[in-house]
Swiss-Prot record:
Taxonomic source organism: Bos taurus
Purpose of the protein: Required for axonemal dynein assembly and ciliary motility in ciliated organs, including Kupffer's vesicle, during embryogenesis. Facilitates the onset of robust cilia motility during development.
Keyword Transferase found: no
Keyword Phosphoprotein: no
SMART domains documented for this protein: WD40
Stated name of the protein: Dynein assembly factor with WD repeat domains 1
Protein localization: Cytoplasm, Cytoskeleton, Flagellum basal body; Cytoplasm, Cytoskeleton, Flagellum axoneme
GO biological process, one term: intraciliary transport
Length: 415
């Protein structure tokens, strides 16, 4: 094995190694999730050298410099104030979803008008209209971090793969017998997973366009689906009240998480893949050990359904959004509620941390999105202007652009 280059990854903090093994270029990452501005860099470099044979003594100064750059970045706490940059009347019929590419340079919108549109964030101009579906385009995604492909899942029971550059369709994936309502690329961008009202999920090969596996076992629609960070596991959440974890390379069921007593609304791994977080219409979130599938905690306190939940990149904080109009932040270590986010006047359907992990973004049926301090729970900003419910909101990779999508058929860019 021969080390070719070292690359920085800012969020979450880490160093990517590009190395050659038997003539092939491979990558692996050293995750530095606990890095903070006070970390002893020399001691950390020694630790890394002991654990990683590719990092030889001759590379230690370079690694030290990279870690110092990461530390500087972590020290820059963003107090960015967002302003409305553009309003896009994206589609004639209602929007279903919005998604950003990694850099935030472009984003996509799905709609009841059976199309997906690709937009330039800086100018607000439409770059492509992706046409071909015969029903609502509901689930959409970029193959981040690459960002050169788009997947669209439709009520017409198919998923299509598109080129970002040309807007041309590469493949149409057929096989589901009911609407596709969720989809995800694996981190390597070799597979697309689709979840459907037909109770199954399917994995598709991006190169060949062929179906690789069908994941069967749920008894109701699959509404949430995601890969873990390394891409070797996939998680599906269903209206049958359960969540199942599958092996991505064999399609084998690893285990089913049973314990919620109502429909699942979200299911995600934390960054290091040690924990799984599930949110449910039963008003609770549960934390599960990702190794054995055992429930390690139930997070309570909300008075109504949990509509969304997520980890920050360190996996130390958990955020939950509820139909009771509040969001909460829990500590993953103590499982206690750290702070409550109060201020919305309607249900909160979306919640996410910014990439730095110090801000939270919420979208609500009260027609506003809000930005909160993740430590104190203080509301820092209210993004107003939509005339109907906000169902989708997202940060870009740097955390300095926000997109909101609303039932008023517009998208707003904030920067």
């Amino acid at each position: 094995m021969k080390l070719k280059s070292l690359l920085l990854r800012y969020y979450p903090p880490g160093i990517m190694l590009e190395y050659e093994k038997s003539g092939q270029l491979k990558t692996k990452s050293i995750d530095l999730l606990d890095l903070d501005p006070s970390t002893d860099v020399s001691a950390l470099v020694e630790e890394i050298q002991k654990a990683e044979p590719l990092i030889t003594a001759s590379r230690s100064d370079q690694v030290k410099l990279l870690i110092q750059r990461l530390q500087n970045k972590l020290g820059q706490h963003s107090n960015h104030k967002f302003y409305l940059f553009k309003v896009l009347r994206a589609h004639i019929l209602p929007l279903t979803n919005v998604a950003l590419n990694k850099s935030g340079s472009c984003f996509i919108t799905g709609s009841y008008d059976r199309t997906c549109k690709l937009w330039d964030t800086a100018s607000g101009e439409e770059l492509h209209t992706l046409e071909g579906h015969r029903n609502v385009v509901y689930a959409i995604a970029f193959n981040n971090p690459y960002g050169d492909k788009i997947a669209t899942g439709s009520f017409d029971k198919t998923c299509k793969l598109w080129s970002v550059e040309t807007g041309k369709c590469y493949h149409t994936f057929r096989g589901h017998t009911a609407e596709i309502v969720c989809l995800s690329f694996n981190p390597q961008s070799t597979l697309v997973a689709t979840g459907s009202m037909d109770t199954t999920a399917k994995l598709w090969d991006i190169q060949s366009g062929e179906e690789v596996f069908t994941l069967t076992g749920h008894s109701a629609e699959i509404i949430s689906l995601s890969f873990n960070t390394s891409g070797n596991r996939i998680i599906t959440g269903s209206f049958d009240h359960t969540v199942t974890v599958w092996e991505a390379d064999t399609g084998r069921k690893v285990y089913t998480l049973i314990g919620h007593c109502a429909e699942i609304s979200s299911a995600v791994f934390n960054w290091d893949c040690s924990l799984i977080l599930t949110g449910s219409m039963d008003k609770t979130c549960k934390l599960w050990d990702a190794v054995n599938g055992k429930c390690v905690a139930t997070l309570t306190g909300h008075d109504d359904e949990i509509l969304d939940s997520c980890f920050d990149y360190t996996g130390k904080l958990i955020a939950t959004a509820s139909a009771d109009g509040t969001a909460r932040i829990f500590s993953a270590a103590t499982r206690e509620c750290v702070t409550k986010l109060e201020g919305h006047e309607g249900e909160i359907s979306k919640i996410s941390f910014n990439p730095q992990g110090n801000r939270l973004l919420t979208g609500s049926s009260d027609k506003t999105a809000r930005i909160w301090d993740a430590q104190t729970g203080q509301c820092l900003q209210v993004l107003e202007g939509h005339t109907d419910e906000i169902f989708s909101c997202a940060f870009n990779y740097k955390g300095d652009i926000i997109i909101t999508g609303s039932k008023d058929n517009t998208c707003r860019i904030w920067r």
